[in-house]
Amino acid sequence: DPPIAPTVLLFPPSADQLTTZTVTIVCVANKFRPDDITVTWKVDDEIQQSGIENSTTPQSPEDCTYXLSSTLSLTKAQYNSHSYTCQVHNSAGSIVZSFNRGDC
């Protein structure tokens, strides 16, 4: 089967989360194959190494694609005014999604 690049969505913390001490940003990659996928998180263009949890969903029987959820956890103070980027790469290509905290 030919490789398929993922569809990527980036979700900022919910309003409820912003009242707690820890916030999470979730990057979801859907409908990709094969599962040779890497996720890179950047905060203000600096690659993040910690606070990341990835979970891959097994292939769908319909089209043999995979889904992945990657969560970046931050303290509320860390989250205040930065830009956040999730870069997802597999053999079909790279997809980059980002948002700026100041714009939300």
From Swiss-Prot:
Q: By its UniProt entry, which InterPro entries does this protein fall under?
A: Ig-like_dom (IPR007110), Ig-like_dom_sf (IPR036179), Ig-like_fold (IPR013783), Ig_C1-set (IPR003597), Immune_Resp_Modulators (IPR050380)
- Pfam family of the protein (one): C1-set
Cystine links in this protein are 27-86
Residue intervals of the Ig-like domain: 6-100
Q: Which Gene3D superfamilies does this UniProt record tie to the protein?
A: Immunoglobulins
Q: Does the keyword Disulfide bond apply?
A: yes
Give the matching PROSITE patterns.
IG_LIKE
Keywords of the record, alphabetical order, are:
Disulfide bond, Immunoglobulin domain
Q: What else is known?
A: This chain was obtained from pooled immunoglobulin of homozygous b9 rabbits.
Protein name, please? Ig kappa-b9 chain C region
* Protein species of origin: Oryctolagus cuniculus
